[in-house]
Structures are given as C-alpha cells and as structure tokens.
C-alpha cells in the first residue's frame, strides 16, 4: 500500500506556513470540525469533487482534517464528458499526487444517447448528465453522506441550505423540511435510504476562498488566471473556443483576448470574463470590486427563474 504520509513539505497540508488571520482560521476550524463529524456519524461518506477552486479548498481541508492518514473516503467526480481539458488533466494529477480514491461516473444512458449541451440544451443536458448521473453514482456506492463545496454566498437557494442538507431516498431536497442547527451541533440521524449532503464551506465567501488559497498555497486549474485565449461570443457569454467539438454558428467568429474564468464547469456552458489578473493577488483585488456573482457565468443558472432551486430539489449538487 502506498505510504499515506508524504514526506515532502508540499504534500503535507500541515506544513509550516505563515499563521492564518483569525477570520480564515475560524472558517478552517469549522470546516475541519464538519469533516470529522460526518466521518464519525455516517457509514459511507463520499466527497463530491468537481475540480474547481472550491473543490480544491475542500480537498485541502479534508487532508488537514485526517492528516497524517489518507483521506478516509473516496472522491466522486460526475463527469459529463464536456469538462475543460485542463480540468481533467488537473484531476488526474491531483489524485495521483495525494493517493486519492477517485471514482469517475458518466451517465451510461446519456453517453449511449449522445446527450450534449448543443443538441439538447443546457437544462436537459444538466438534468441527465449531472443530476441523474449523480443520483446513479450515489446509489451505486450506497453513500449515506456526500460532502459538497457549495457556499451560501453563491446563489439564493444555497443561502437557505443547512450545513447538513437532508435528502429523501430518491435524493430530493425539501427546503421546508430541514433541521435547526444550533451553534456547531448537527443532527445526523437518518432513516434507511435517506442521505445527507454536508457543506463544510457554507459560511465561506468567494473572497475567503481565494485568500485561503493564497495563504495555503493551494494549486488550481490554470483557467482561473487570465491569459490570451480563443473564444466566441454566444448567448451573452464568452465561450472558450479551443475544443474541436465547438462548432461555430452562423455569424460567429473566433476572437482572442485576455480572459479567465471565475467558475468552472462544462466548457460550452461556462462563460469567461475579460481580465488582466494573472496572479492570485490580482484575482483577489479584482474580486473585491466585483458587483456580480461568479455564477453569472453559468448558463445552467439562467434556464428559468429559480432554476437552481428546482435543480437542487431534484437532487442536483
């Protein structure tokens, strides 16, 4: 069995660094407490790993929570087949570097029927290749708790979600049927077939995430930093045009400019922003004056009014 206690300083999440400021330290302590609570309370936890910045922070916190042992639960990546190529390369490198138990799941029905965001639209594609696929993977693994990287500052439906978010046997979420959470006491009692989504980053903000990444020197997918990239403008978004599967529509032309991504997902459904931020400090400075949510760059959040809450009620991340 591989040694679970890496002897390189960079592999050790507890390596000596400058002390965290009190705000970030309090957030870190809360997140580590949630990880340990879930691991102690539930029989088969799993961590949902989407490869983005929040997942990278979540993984770092999980490694801290259980160091020097291995992360004691698998990571689940629900792959749609349309992720940025840089994301998949980063995922594989990370799993190997930290000796992670990584599960990849692709909806076999969606793959067989060639469900794509171009042929079926963002709503149907997301329902089949993400929500349905996630339910399949959780059922197959018989997982009773799933860690996620959602934060309350991201979007309205997430703002009212508890740290322990209870799901029915078919993974549905009813926001009216959630339990009170007093201080740091969480009630994890569930009936057979029910499950919990646990969110250790609930009380973090986007700027907190980036400041923590800077303080802890956490690696990220390079797409978060600005560089000259090719893109097309479509439906009010700048879509990366570096994948051969992206076909230009009538009137579209490939452009090139300094762009980056505030959020990562499926490349046809994720819009970039114009930016000159090539370093962590520049990204943080840019965010401190931002006036719109990072999820403005997600096509799936624009499907209809209340679309994210509808997706979450049906079992979405």
Curated annotation (Swiss-Prot):
Enzyme Commission (EC) number: 2.7.7.4
InterPro entries: PAPS_reduct_dom, Rossmann-like_a/b/a_fold, SO4_adenylTrfase_ssu, Sulfate_adenylyltrnsfr_sub2
Cell cycle keyword on record: no
GO molecular function, one term: ATP binding
Pathway: Sulfur metabolism; hydrogen sulfide biosynthesis; sulfite from sulfate: step 1/3
Region Disordered, residue ranges: 1-21, 298-317
Alphabetized UniProt keyword annotations: ATP-binding, Nucleotide-binding, Nucleotidyltransferase, Transferase
Biological process annotations from GO: hydrogen sulfide biosynthetic process; sulfate assimilation
Gene3D superfamilies found in the cross-reference section: HUPs
Substrates-to-products reaction catalysed: sulfate + ATP + H(+) = adenosine 5'-phosphosulfate + diphosphate
Pfam families (alphabetical): PAPS_reduct (PF01507)
Annotated HAMAP family: Sulf_adenylyltr_sub2
Family: Belongs to the PAPS reductase family. CysD subfamily.
Record's subunit section: Heterodimer composed of CysD, the smaller subunit, and CysN.
Purpose: With CysN forms the ATP sulfurylase (ATPS) that catalyzes the adenylation of sulfate producing adenosine 5'-phosphosulfate (APS) and diphosphate, the first enzymatic step in sulfur assimilation pathway. APS synthesis involves the formation of a high-energy phosphoric-sulfuric acid anhydride bond driven by GTP hydrolysis by CysN coupled to ATP hydrolysis by CysD.
Record-given protein name: Sulfate adenylyltransferase subunit 2
Gene from which this protein is expressed: cysD
């Amino acid at each position: 069995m591989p040694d679970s206690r890496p002897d390189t300083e960079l592999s050790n999440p507890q390596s000596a660094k400058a002390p965290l400021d009190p705000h970030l330290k309090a957030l870190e302590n809360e997140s580590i407490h949630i990880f340990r609570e879930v691991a102690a309370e539930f029989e088969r936890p799993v961590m949902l790993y989407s490869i983005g910045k929040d997942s990278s922070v979540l993984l770092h916190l999980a490694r801290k929570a259980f160091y020097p042992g291995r992360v004691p639960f698998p990571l689940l990546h629900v792959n749609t087949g349309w992720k940025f190529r840089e994301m998949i390369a980063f995922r594989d490198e990370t799993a190997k570097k930290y000796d992670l138990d990584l599960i990849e799941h692709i909806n076999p029905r969606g793959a067989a029927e060639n469900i794509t965001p171009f042929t079926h639209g963002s709503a149907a594609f997301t329902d089949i290749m993400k929500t349905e696929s996630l339910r399949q993977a959780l059922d197959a693994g018989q997982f009773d708790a799933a860690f996620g990287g959602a934060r309350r500052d991201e979007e309205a439906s997430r703002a009212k979600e508890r740290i322990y978010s209870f799901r029915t046997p078919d993974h549905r979420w009813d926001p009216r049927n959630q339990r009170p959470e007093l201080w740091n006491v969480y009630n994890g009692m569930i009936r057979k077939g029910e499950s919990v989504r646990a969110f250790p980053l609930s009380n973090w903000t986007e700027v907190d995430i980036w400041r923590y990444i800077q303080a802890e020197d956490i690696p990220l997918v390079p797409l978060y930093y600005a560089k000259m990239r090719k893109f097309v403008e479509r439906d009010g978004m700048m879509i990366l045009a570096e994948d051969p599967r992206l076909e230009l529509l009538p009137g579209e032309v490939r452009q090139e400019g300094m762009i980056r991504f505030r959020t990562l997902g499926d490349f046809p459904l994720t819009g970039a922003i114009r930016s000159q931020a090539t370093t962590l400090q520049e990204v943080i400075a840019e965010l401190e004056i931002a006036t719109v949510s990072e999820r403005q760059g997600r096509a799936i959040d624009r499907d209809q009014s209340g679309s994210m809450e509808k997706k979450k009620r049906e079992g979405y991340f």
